[in-house]
Structure formats: structure tokens, C-alpha cells
Amino acid sequence: MWELDPKTLEKWDKEYFWHPFTQMKVYREEENLIFERGEGVYLWDIYGRKYIDAISSLWCNVHGHNHPKLNNAVMKQLCKVAHTTTLGSSNVPAILLAKKLVEISPEGLNKVFYSEDGAEAVEIAIKMAYHYWKNKGVKGKNVFITLSEAYHGDTVGAVSVGGIELFHGTYKDLLFKTIKLPSPYLYCKEKYGELCPECTADLLKQLEDILKSREDIVAVIMEAGIQAAAGMLPFPPGFLKGVRELTKKYDTLMIVDEVATGFGRTGTMFYCEQEGVSPDFMCLGKGITGGYLPLAATLTTDEVFNAFLGEFGEAKHFYHGHTYTGNNLACSVALANLEVFEEERTLEKLQPKIKLLKERLQEFWELKHVGDVRQLGFMAGIELVKDKEKGEPFPYGERTGFKVAYKCREKGVFLRPLGDVMVLMMPLVIEEDEMNYVIDTLKWAIKELEKEV
């Protein structure tokens, strides 16, 4: 089936397929990768060329491609039933997964609402938080507090609480109102020169000043420990915990977006664990199925859930749902994903790799066109600059990050930058020699810039 020559596939790809976050005029002018199969941390394109998947297929692959246990989970469920609705009915894998997610999540997050991707998980949290206050009879709450440089997905609600001008500015007239605190990393670096307790205290005071002076705040929403899509911008120590303490003090809800950070990316199952934070909502996606199928989840508390209980005629229930909510196949592979974490001791084996990554990242500071190096757990960003001394960036239109990524492709490493930030988000199961090859290749590709600039 589908035995087509590569040239035909390339032609049809450019003729019919509109790709996400892609300037299609440029895409049509270039040679692009069309992947056909994967095994472990490797991908093969339609010409049989092999690449290390150094971005985990956009940060979602956990245990590698074509994992036998995950494959089997999908096939076993497929032989039973692929999908049944969860609107007023249920299915076995969705029930089992909900129980398991509650068991591994911060204490108090006892209810699970499914969706298909991280933006939807955030959208659901936004609507639930707003609806919660309505059901409680509290009037006038219609404002969210978020962060500059935030990214929570691309649906209108998620964009409203976002803060990346390049991605979100076009849609500003469509969006609901928010209050934005400064990006913690950028604020700390500009004012204090580093991430430090003094900066944490400064940011928390700004938040407290808002919370104690307003009664219209629905919730505070932020990513967990790092603003990943903004270029891997980590939070100062204790910031997330401090925010949680303030939301409790001022009776405000807290939404934590663990879509990018969840399922081991920061070294623990969820970043919230590292600061002892249990929010009112936790949004999950990406790695929840090990990178196999679209699935996301919004976890919340009994307090929130109970506010939606009532007689049918009261119409308190949550009017939200998708066709594939709690899909049987996706929930089955998500369960297998969590079993692999336990059986293969994934998080335990990850710790020396995080240490190796930290050590190897120091080498990038020596490079002429590297202006900053950032890391949280197994997530890293290397920022490229035209002039290190002046902090001058490359012009956006030069696509310098993509040029470096294309160089890496020549040596069999698949990367996708965030602007001019080279992102390393490797599958958790990558071996240390494979890590070293990725890092060596990226260093070489950045050095090649010196010949062009």
C-alpha cells in the first residue's frame, strides 16, 4: 500500500500539505525531510537516510520509536475497539489511566478530564477555572494572570494567556484580557544578572501586589519551571512554590502547564514535585503516550470538581467535550508508557544523562556565536547571537537557527530550533554515546557559522 517514489511524495507534500509553524513559500523552495519509519532514537526518511531524533519529534517521544510494549498496547486494544465515546459512557483504558495519573500526580489532584493535545488541556483548565467561580456564585472574576513570553498552545484561549509577540500578536483583537508579569528569566537576567533568591522575591512581590489589590482574578497560569517555547527560559529557584503560596493566601486558583515538562523531561515525573507544588489544575500532554498518539489531560481537585455537581436542571455541569475525549487506543498506550517508566527505571537511568548534558553544555560557552546556554533537567537551549560582546542577535529573516539545524542534518542529527535557539530535547532513553554525537555535531555546526558571518 502507498508504494510511491520519493519524488512524487515530495511533490504532493508541497502541493497539498500546509505544515504547522512553517513558511510554506520557503518550505517549497527547500529539500525537506519526509520520515518513513523509526526505531529507538532513530528515524529514517524516504531515501533511507538515518537521523537521531534529537527533539523527540517535537518533545513528545519518551522511550524511543517502535517500542515493543507500546506497539503491543496499541495492537491489543485495536483488536478490541479503536474508539468509543466518553460523553455519558466510559471505557476500560480511560478509567485505568485516570486512576494511574492521580496516583503519580501531586497530592490533591484527584480528577482527570481528557482531551487530545496540550493546548486543549490548557483551554479546559481556563474554562473550568472560570466556570468554577460562576458555579460558586462569585461574580466579577474574569481576568487571568500570566507571564510575558508564555506559551500554552495555539487555540484562542491558550493564546490569550500566552505572551510571545511573534506567535500571538496577530490575534490580539480576538483575545480575552490578562495581566502579564515579566518573564522570570529575562527579568532576573536584566535586573540582577542571574537567577537568584532576590529576583524570586521581587517577582513574587509584584504578583502579591496584584492579588491583594484586585478581586477579579480567576487564576494564575504558568508553565512548570521553564518557558520552553520562549527558548528554554528557566524560572529562578522557588518561584513556582512562591506563586502557589500566594494563590492560596489570596484564594486564587493556580493552573500549572506541565505539557512540555511532564513525564520526565526535568528529571522527575512532573516538575511540580521538585518544588512541592500541588496546583488546582495541572495540564498534561506531549509525553503522556510516549509520543505515540494524541492525548492530553487536565487534572484538578475535588474542590473544583464538586463545584460542578448538582441536579440536572441546575445546569452546573461542565459543557465541554471532544469527539475523541478519552480515546481507547490513546489511553491504552499511555498506560503502557507509564508501565515502561517503572519497568525500565527510566527516571533513575536519566539522572547521569542530565549530569552529562550539564557538563557538555559548558563547552558551548566557548563558541563565538553562542550568547547563552540554558538547561532544566533534560531540556536545553543554546542561543545563537551575531555578536557575543554586544548581545546582538542575528536578523530574524536570516533563519540562522535553521541553517545550523540543516548542517546537523548532514551528519544525521534531526533538530528544530526555536528561532535562533538550538533546542536539545532528546528521548529519555538515548544512550550517552548517542548524546555525545548529537552534542559534537551541534558544536561543529555552530562553528561552521564562523565561516559565513
Curated annotation (Swiss-Prot):
Gene behind the chain: bioA
Official protein name in the record: Adenosylmethionine-8-amino-7-oxononanoate aminotransferase
Taxonomic superkingdom: Bacteria
Amino acids binding substrate: Y151, K286, G321, R416
TM stretches of this protein: none
Keyword Mitochondrion: no
Cofactor: pyridoxal 5'-phosphate
Family, per entry: Belongs to the class-III pyridoxal-phosphate-dependent aminotransferase family. BioA subfamily.
Protein source organism: Aquifex aeolicus (strain VF5)
UniProt keywords, alphabetically: Aminotransferase, Biotin biosynthesis, Cytoplasm, Pyridoxal phosphate, S-adenosyl-L-methionine, Transferase
EC number of the protein: 2.6.1.62
Pathway stated in the Swiss-Prot or TrEMBL entry: Cofactor biosynthesis; biotin biosynthesis; 7,8-diaminononanoate from 8-amino-7-oxononanoate (SAM route): step 1/1
Subunit-level organization: Homodimer.
Swiss-Prot/TrEMBL catalytic activity: (8S)-8-amino-7-oxononanoate + S-adenosyl-L-methionine = S-adenosyl-4-methylsulfanyl-2-oxobutanoate + (7R,8S)-7,8-diammoniononanoate
Modified residues (N6-(pyridoxal phosphate)lysine): K286
Localization (cell): Cytoplasm
Enzyme type, top EC level: transferase
Function of the molecule: Catalyzes the transfer of the alpha-amino group from S-adenosyl-L-methionine (SAM) to 7-keto-8-aminopelargonic acid (KAPA) to form 7,8-diaminopelargonic acid (DAPA). It is the only aminotransferase known to utilize SAM as an amino donor.
Any one Gene Ontology cellular component term annotated for this protein: cytoplasm
One Pfam family this sequence matches: Aminotran_3
Keyword rRNA-binding: no
Gene Ontology BP annotations: biotin biosynthetic process
InterPro entries for the chain: Aminotrans_3, Aminotrans_3_PPA_site, BioA, PyrdxlP-dep_Trfase, PyrdxlP-dep_Trfase_major, PyrdxlP-dep_Trfase_small
An example Gene Ontology molecular-function term: adenosylmethionine-8-amino-7-oxononanoate transaminase activity
